[in-house]
């Protein structure tokens, strides 16, 4: 089971009882840390003003810049499977991790045994965008001091990853048609 967490969160956020239960059920559990969080490599992280500018550009329909894409993060997930010599996996993702899981399932169908996409989205145009409360929460988390960031990292959250990961999400576009084509059992 390949388990992918969402925006700015590491594998530490998954509840140990879930992981232990899967392992006790005979599953090999692989907890993935996305780029810029946890035990994964770091990209040059953009700042608060850069993120605010990208969010404004997105709101008015302009192209958003991002250091990487969700498709890159899906390729990272498959590279982890390759490194562990795992041919096929049940893919479980939460929030942004669910988006990455969707991409794994339709770009790498031969590697996907099933998909569970938790509290995620296809980013369909008819769905409402994140509200001001969510954007404020992202901005506030991005403004954390070094001490606050260290405390959050201890819990598994990496606020400095927000600009890069948020812009990767904004650039991903509507995946509705691609998700409809997923052949693996999907929940």
Predicted ranges, named:
Residues 167-187:
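Conserved serine/cysteine hydrolase catalytic core
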Residues 1-58:
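Conserved HGGG/HGGXW glycine-rich cap/lid loop of the alpha/beta-hydrolase fold
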Residues 5, 89, 93-95:
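Conserved alpha/beta-hydrolase "nucleophile elbow" surrounding the catalytic nucleophile
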Residues 56-68, 146-154:
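Short glycine/proline- and acidic residue-enriched helix-loop micro-motifs
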Residues 99-107, 113-142:
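Flexible "cap/lid" loop of the alpha/beta hydrolase fold
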Residues 130-172:
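The alpha/beta-hydrolase serine catalytic core
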Residues 28, 87-90, 111-114:
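Structural signature of beta-strand start/N-cap positions in the alpha/beta core
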Residues 59, 64-67, 71-89:
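Conserved acidic catalytic loop of the alpha/beta-hydrolase fold
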